[in-house]
Amino acid sequence: MINKDLIALYKEHKQVNQIKEALSGEHKNRLHVTGIHGSALTVVLGAIHSLDNAVHVLVVDDKERAAYCFNDLEQIFNERELPFDKRRILFFPTAYRRPYEIEQTDNANVLSRAEVLNKVNSVGSNLVVVTYPEALSEKVVTRQILKKNTFSLREGEEVSMDFLTDVLYEYGFNRTDFVVEPGEFSIRGGIVDVFSFSDEFPYRIEFSGDEVESIRTFNPVDQLSKQRMTKISLLPDVQNRLSKEARETLLAYLPESAVWWVDDVTFIHDRLERELDKAREIFENLNKDIKHLAPGELFMGGREFFKELGARKVIEYGTGSHFKGESIVFRTQSQPPFNRNFELLLDNLRKHTLELYINIICADQERQLNRLQTIFEDLEQGKTEKERVAVKYLQLGLHEGFIDLDRKSTRLNSSHVSE
């Protein structure tokens, strides 16, 4: 079994198609989806993502859970090894460790945020963005400002190295001997290396006179080429370099047709208010001789969140709902604990086989699946083919297994069965 088979199962799911139909059309929609447990959330979202071209934003309660959901989706769609320009599953983290302290920004996170903004600008649809309240609280530069501060370059384009160097200096890039992190560039002969905030790898731009001969991404550690590019976008540190520019919320930045998946609207409101209060407290103690944007211009509070979310398509997937809307009920259960009791696991799988469930065991690595398969074969020695438990194996490291009672043909277990 492969990942596409799992998504294919859920594309035929009755409730998944109810969500798809409810989201169709231009008007704003309100859905309350209940009964989703374990990694059923990411599988259902993955199926919806496969059925439409919208931008879907999954907002979960904290960074750790957001990372798990992102990892699920990244694996479901086999995007872990894809170059960034091919990816459709994106992570939107916080940039600041502390508000107003540029030196406390996380460069890797600034890169991830810039990648999302750039991807939305260049692609605009068929994306999934995973985020959490603290990241959502930080406003972003507007589309117009991002476009104004993005320099596009094509293979075969006539442009001089001197002109490109001037652009990089103007954008705040630092010249170094070797590029190591975003925001740096280097020049050696007819080659310009640039680590843009638009890609996870730096670009190697080779010139022939005043013409761009070739563009490749490369690994800064071993200097080996990764991928040939025909067109690239050079993007500066929009988080800090453009700190005085006008900002807007991610809600305003994304297309109005974007679908927002939210667990607990009230919880997010309260968390955003707390983040805004924290920024206000720090702002009051700043050096007044240096001009800073006010907290409300840099951070989104709960009221602003309520107002802007109210004008968007929203799917609430928690136990309660803030908006009035159509209710869609799934019947899933969290995977029960087996605590390395493989006989108990087999009994459970056998019970579901008799009830005509499909038993799917998932694990991140093939060796884990092989180990489980060997254990099952040892425990079922002497049994006929009909007496043996029917199991499908899927190399997919979902964070949490679940049982789907609706399909009655789907049973999902994660690699946690052997823990």
Name each model-derived stretch.
Residues 412-419:
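Single conserved hydrophobic/aromatic residue that forms the stacking wall/gate
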Residues 1-411:
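ASCE RecA-like P-loop NTPase motor cores
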